[in-house]
């Protein structure tokens, strides 16, 4: 009888705790590089329950367009790659230490192309998207506050153009734009008050145990 009551009480306790998620996100428009963009995300409100996990997705978007012109007197073969690297920081020091080691890289390559003397080839515009997810389990204490709140993420871009082949005779132009966004997801256990009917059932079980003990005595 005692074991049954303990099991019943444990069942009610388990039913009271429920796993939940809450998320925040932002997205900035694509702008001509180089960019510095900032967005705001929410802290976890610790009054909602116990924070058990958090993950941050860093998102990048870019638009690439470029040309290559063969300035040599003879035909040339070359591969042109346009790229943008997005680097991150945060208003929360512990988070900044994590995201500063994460970059979102985007690129577009022409692939090997043959250029006749004086020929110009154009590539793009082409849109690219990429993202990286960081696990924030090691800094959960920094990601919550009673009543919630906000923090910021900032991204900066470094863009460039690389030419492989062509003997140094491929002249280029580029038009690059980029934008960044982010999404944070919190996982938490919400402690709910048992329903009155459940409390009554537990009370009856405990009362029954008392009667059982008295009869046994």
PLM regions: where:
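Short coil-to-beta strand junction motifs in C2/discoidin
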Residues: 71-85
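N-terminal segment immediately downstream of the Sec signal-peptide cleavage site
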Residues: 20-74, 176-180, 186-192
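Positively charged n-region of N-terminal signal peptides that target proteins for export
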Residues: 1-4, 213-217
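Sec-dependent signal peptide recognition
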Residues: 2-8, 198-201
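N-terminal signal peptide c-region/cleavage motif recognized by signal peptidases
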Residues: 14-16
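A short, hydrophobic C-terminal helix/tail in secreted or cell-surface proteins
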Residues: 194-212
């Amino acid at each position: 009888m005692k074991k049954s009551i303990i099991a019943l009480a444990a069942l009610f306790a388990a039913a009271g705790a429920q796993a939940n998620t809450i998320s925040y996100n932002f997205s900035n428009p694509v702008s001509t590089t180089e960019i510095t963009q900032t967005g705001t995300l929410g802290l976890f409100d610790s009054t909602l329950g116990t924070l058990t996990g958090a993950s941050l997705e860093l998102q990048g978007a870019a638009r690439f367009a470029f040309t290559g012109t063969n300035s040599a007197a003879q035909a040339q073969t070359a591969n042109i790659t346009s790229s943008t690297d997005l680097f991150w920081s945060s208003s929360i020091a512990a988070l900044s230490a994590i995201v500063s080691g994460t970059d979102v890289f985007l690129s577009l390559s022409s692939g090997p192309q043959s250029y006749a003397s004086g020929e110009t080839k154009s590539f793009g515009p082409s849109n690219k998207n990429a993202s990286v997810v960081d696990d924030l389990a090691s800094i959960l204490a920094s990601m919550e506050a009673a009543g919630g709140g906000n923090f910021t993420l900032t991204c900066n871009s470094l863009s460039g153009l690389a030419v492989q082949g062509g003997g140094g005779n491929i002249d280029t132009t580029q038009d690059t734009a980029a934008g960044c966004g982010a999404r944070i997801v919190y996982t938490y256990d919400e402690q709910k008050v048992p329903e009155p009917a459940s409390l009554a059932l537990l009370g009856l079980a405990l009362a029954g145990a008392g009667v059982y003990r008295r009869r046994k005595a």
